[in-house]
A protein has these predicted regions:
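A short acidic, Gly/Pro-enriched loop at the edge of an enzyme's catalytic core
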Residues: 83-94
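A short SAM/SAH-binding and catalytic strip from SAM-dependent methyltransferases
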Residues: 94-107
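Short alpha-helix
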Residues: 159-173
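A short glycine-rich, Lys/Arg-flanked "PGG" loop and its adjoining helix->strand segment in the class I
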Residues: 108-123
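Class I SAM-dependent methyltransferase SAM/SAH-binding core
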Residues: 35-84, 109
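C-terminal helical/coil "lid" or tail adjacent to the Rossmann-like core of SAM-dependent
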Residues: 178-233
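Conserved class I S-adenosyl-L-methionine
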Residues: 1-34, 45-49, 66-69, 123-148
Length: 252
């Protein structure tokens, strides 16, 4: 049931991910000469934007296909998981991450690694799914799968914490939380709508099913969600909630 990523599908159905990253990039406030790690860089769209500031940027991603897409942009990218970074100690001024951390299974190992690679005074700037993120989608998807005797384990696909719980977790790993916020962000989906969203962001679950059952589950999930998330013109809006934070490593 491992989630997989196809760069072309992601660009088609998930363009809103880099497209709605302006605010977290402002929080990062990258400067020329800084060395920055883009954790979960995907196809490298945001990595390239950070590099355009004059910062020296290295991307890391666990998906071989996404790593290849990012490298095609001329970006330096390492293929690795967030829980085991192939980087030296205290070598980055900042670690940046957008729409990735809620996919990380071992949050504690990830935080230890981020702290290890940051210089004293370095900052961890990230946006991820927060408490309540895609709640309607998740409930509908689970309900439809249960109807077809495939309850699965939707609850372990993603981790959507509250600001309070995540701030505590960061502090337990030696970070000082400078700023953290939970932000409701209704998100217009691509022209492919909920069908495309499910095929992209729940591919790990769907691809484990027989094709006929997969298509049935997609169709029934879309039908169940349409009254709440599709407007009269057929446009879909995802019920996104983002958790955004800046956490720093104390000097000395």
């Amino acid at each position: 049931m491992m989630q997989t990523w196809d760069p072309r599908t992601y660009e088609k159905n998930g363009a809103f991910v880099p497209g709605m990253a302006n605010e977290i990039l402002q929080w990062l406030d990258a400067a020329a000469g800084e060395r920055i790690l883009d954790l979960g860089c995907g196809d490298g769209q945001l990595t390239a934007r950070i590099a355009a500031t004059g910062a020296s940027v290295v991307g890391v991603d666990a998906s071989p296909t996404m790593v290849a897409a990012a490298r095609a942009r001329g970006i330096e990218v390492l293929e690795a998981s967030a829980e085991s970074l192939p980087c030296g100690d205290a070598c980055f001024d900042a670690v940046f991450s957008n729409a990735v951390l809620h996919w990380v299974r071992d949050q504690d190992a990830m935080m230890d690694e981020v702290r290890r690679v940051l210089k004293p005074g370095g900052r961890f700037v990230a946006e991820m799914g927060g408490h309540g993120n895609v709640a309607a989608i998740s409930v509908a998807f689970s309900a439809v799968r249960a109807r077809h005797a495939d309850p699965g384990s939707e609850d372990v696909l993603n981790y959507y914490p509250t600001p309070q719980s995540y701030a505590l977790r960061l502090s337990q790993h030696g970070f000082h939380v400078d700023r953290i916020a939970l932000i409701p962000r209704p998100t217009p989906l691509a022209a492919s709508g909920m069908d495309g969203w499910l095929r992209t962001f729940r591919s790990g679950v769907l691809n484990s099913l027989p094709e006929e059952l997969r298509e049935t589950i997609i169709a029934e999930t879309c039908a169940l969600l349409a009254p709440a998330l599709r407007d009269e013109n057929g446009n879909w809006t995802g019920d996104y909630v983002r958790l955004r934070f800046i956490a720093t490593i104390p000097n000395g």
